[in-house]
Amino acid sequence: MDNKEIYKAVLGMIDLTSLNSTDTPSKITVMTGKVNHFHDSFPDYPLPASICVYPNFAKTVAAARENPDVHVTVVGGCFPASQSTLPVKIAECTAAVSDGADEVDIVLALNSFLEKNYEAARREIVEIGSTIRTINPAVLLKVILETGALQEKALIEDASYLAMEAGADFIKTSTGKMQPAATPEAAQIMCDCIRTYHAKTGRMVGFKPAGGISTPEDALTYWNIVSNTLGKAWLDKRYFRFGASRMANNLLSALEDRPVKYY
């Protein structure tokens, strides 16, 4: 594939994201409307994989979207700090799925993980996952490792395996709310773990880099890591996503050879 073919494919892997304190139902409805009418302006390019918002906007996106192939993703479990009690996290995620969320991105409980209380961190993922799947068995659970807080290879490996063994459908680098966010180094470690886990279990776990990803060059970097480490089977939105707010316009600009500010 040449670079433009990759840019086009990546457009269809983006979780188009708005996670701002100033988000309103009107703003989220406008963003969803742009996705609905994307093919009016760009008929040859794919729609984003999902629209990613705070949990209180799950119902807004679900009501406004016209194509169910564009999923409703929420960040849940008291994102981005994950600092609350498990019942509160479960309640938030459950409400979002009841409101129409197809995917839930939660943050690994670093308050437990960094204290080496791995069972508590694992239990949160298991209980959130099992509860939301009683509402929608097809719901996807992504677990954010916040690799910028871990940094050491061994910690990123431990967090990756813990999340996958607890039932994560995807592991995700970062919330985007702290620095460093996604890095190629962390992505490589996580993809190595996904490959090893798949070899042992046969289960394909997805990978989602997020945070600070905005350029076509970023897209190529993470595409190549996934392609070279995990192979062609992972080059599909079922197993590979990008968390991004600015990258869609930048990819469109690169594809069109002109400045594009559609989203």
Give the label of every model feature segment.
Residues 51-53:
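Short, hydrophobic beta-strand segments that form beta-sheet elements in well-ordered domains
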Residues 250:
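N-terminal beta-loop-helix "entrance" segment that forms/cooperates
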Residues 2-46, 56-207, 214-245, 253-263:
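Alpha/beta enzyme core
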